């Protein structure tokens, strides 16, 4: 698999973008694999990628009944954040945030992550107390968090209704500046290309219709392609 670069972009632009190689193969299913992953969305593709990259498990098939990234991965909020209340959740999602921040470089594929920040608005004194607790949990775990007053919120988002007579008056907010969004289909494509580069078979239009068992152990799958 060739790496994407400014040079390759210029070269293919001059050639009318007709020389790009396929981002991943379209293989026929093999009779046997060490690992079979059902579902070619973000979770399935990422699992295949990290199995291959981190553990050297490459005899892997990802079976997708439709097209890669066409399920829940293509229908979600795309929000990336680690601003949770429970320490376990906060640390788990912060680990994910750090992976996101280097994901485009790791995959050599632009997942279009944009760290534009996230505001959680407080509409009462009680809600502000909860947001402060969450912010303190984040800070204690070394995660960026700021509690903003009304004027600070107004500077970030000037088009809200700041009237005290608004149905949900704004008291302040919890702000995580590193939060943001990513392009969901680019994430799926990046993981697909990365997994394929390690030899993982990505098999589309292959619905799993049943599991083959020996006792309580699953030893295979039945699919629409054999």
What kind of region is each of these model predictions?
Residues 15-23, 45, 216-221:
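Short gly/ser/thr-rich secondary-structure transition/capping motifs
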Residues 52-74:
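Glycine-rich FAD pyrophosphate-binding loop
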Residues 174-226:
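Helical element adjacent to the flavin cofactor pocket in flavoenzyme catalytic cores
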Residues 37-38, 62:
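Hydrophobic Val/Ile/Leu positions in short beta-strands of Rossmann-like dinucleotide-binding domains
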Residues 40-45, 65:
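Glycine-rich Rossmann-fold phosphate-binding loop(s) that bind the pyrophosphate
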Residues 126, 156-170, 212-220:
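A short, glycine/Asx- and small/polar-enriched loop/turn
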Residues 1-35, 50-58:
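Extreme N-terminal leader/targeting segments of oxidoreductases
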Residues 77-159:
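Dinucleotide-binding Rossmann-like beta1-alpha1 core, especially the glycine-rich loop
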């Amino acid at each position: 698999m060739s790496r994407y670069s400014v040079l390759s972009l210029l070269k293919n632009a001059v050639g009318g973008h007709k020389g790009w190689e396929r981002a991943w193969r379209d293989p026929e299913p093999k009779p046997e694999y060490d690992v079979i992953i059902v579902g070619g969305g973000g979770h399935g593709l990422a699992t295949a990628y990290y199995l291959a990259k981190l553990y050297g498990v490459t005899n892997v098939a990802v079976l997708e009944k439709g097209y890669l990234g066409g399920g829940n991965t293509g229908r979600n909020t795309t929000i990336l954040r680690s601003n949770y209340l429970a320490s376990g959740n906060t640390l788990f999602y912060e680990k994910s945030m750090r992976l996101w921040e280097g994901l485009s470089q790791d995959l050599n594929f632009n997942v279009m992550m944009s760290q534009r920040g996230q505001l959680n608005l407080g509409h009462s004194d009680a809600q502000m107390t909860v947001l402060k607790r969450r912010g303190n949990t984040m800070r204690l775990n070394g995660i960026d968090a700021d509690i903003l007053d009304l004027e600070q919120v107004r500077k970030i988002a000037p088009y809200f209704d700041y009237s005290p007579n608004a149905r949900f008056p704004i008291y302040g907010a919890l702000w995580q500046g590193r939060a943001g969004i990513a392009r969901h289909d680019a994430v799926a494509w990046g993981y697909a290309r990365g997994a394929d580069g390690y030899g993982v078979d990505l098999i589309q239009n292959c619905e799993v219709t049943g599991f083959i068992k020996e006792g309580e152990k699953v030893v295979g799958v039945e699919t629409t392609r054999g």
